[in-house]
């Protein structure tokens, strides 16, 4: 199973938000390129970027640093990015820059036609990010809970041709309370495309628990606060995941 380190970008810095609140950000580094290189050197095989300013503005806002990160690690591992991706031109520009995958979140829920077009135009390179609370999809930086059931919506997007689904359990993201294994497995079992777990990874027990259900269709897990605050040693965790996969 892939452990995917997250670099959340705000004003050119690497931060973590607590529960998606822009005004509750912890700055971990003012040199995200160095951070990306660090995770590569620790054995990461994929990198997860979020343009937080972009997510709130609806268009790319950290382009210079994203370009620099891709220049540093883009040849070594696939990089995926979400935040502010609202049109096909933005996707094309990012992929031309060396991004392996784009992640579409709120825009997929609000304008499913855009997601459909993106999957047609860039097959295999579009990941959908679904955030849910108690099984219902949330949008707009978690500000709004919709009446969409996460499994129903994910199945519909699977039919569009998305590469995979990043599933975030909102109750847990950035709160270090453990991954919602049950909800993640339920989603993975309903789909034939891979699910990437996100939100709440806190320690090696969470890694063990996820690896135990990897065969249900869970391809990886995104980790942020835990690897920055030191409750998970990234290299040790990836080694453990590889050993458990046998």
Curated annotation (Swiss-Prot):
Pathway: Amino-acid biosynthesis; L-histidine biosynthesis; L-histidine from 5-phospho-alpha-D-ribose 1-diphosphate: step 4/9
GO molecular-function terms, A-Z: 1-(5-phosphoribosyl)-5-[(5-phosphoribosylamino)methylideneamino]imidazole-4-carboxamide isomerase activity
HAMAP family per record: HisA
Catalytic residue positions: 8, 131
Catalytic activity line of the entry: 1-(5-phospho-beta-D-ribosyl)-5-[(5-phospho-beta-D-ribosylamino)methylideneamino]imidazole-4-carboxamide = 5-[(5-phospho-1-deoxy-D-ribulos-1-ylimino)methylamino]-1-(5-phospho-beta-D-ribosyl)imidazole-4-carboxamide
Superkingdom field: Bacteria
Full protein name: 1-(5-phosphoribosyl)-5-[(5-phosphoribosylamino)methylideneamino] imidazole-4-carboxamide isomerase
GO biological process assignments: L-histidine biosynthetic process; L-tryptophan biosynthetic process
InterPro entries: Aldolase_TIM (IPR013785), His_biosynth (IPR006062), HisA_bact_arch (IPR006063), Isoase_HisA-like (IPR044524), Isoase_HisA-like_bact (IPR023016), RibuloseP-bd_barrel (IPR011060)
Similarity comment text for this entry: Belongs to the HisA/HisF family.
A GO CC term attached to the entry: cytoplasm
UniProt-annotated location(s): Cytoplasm
Keyword annotations: Amino-acid biosynthesis, Cytoplasm, Histidine biosynthesis, Isomerase
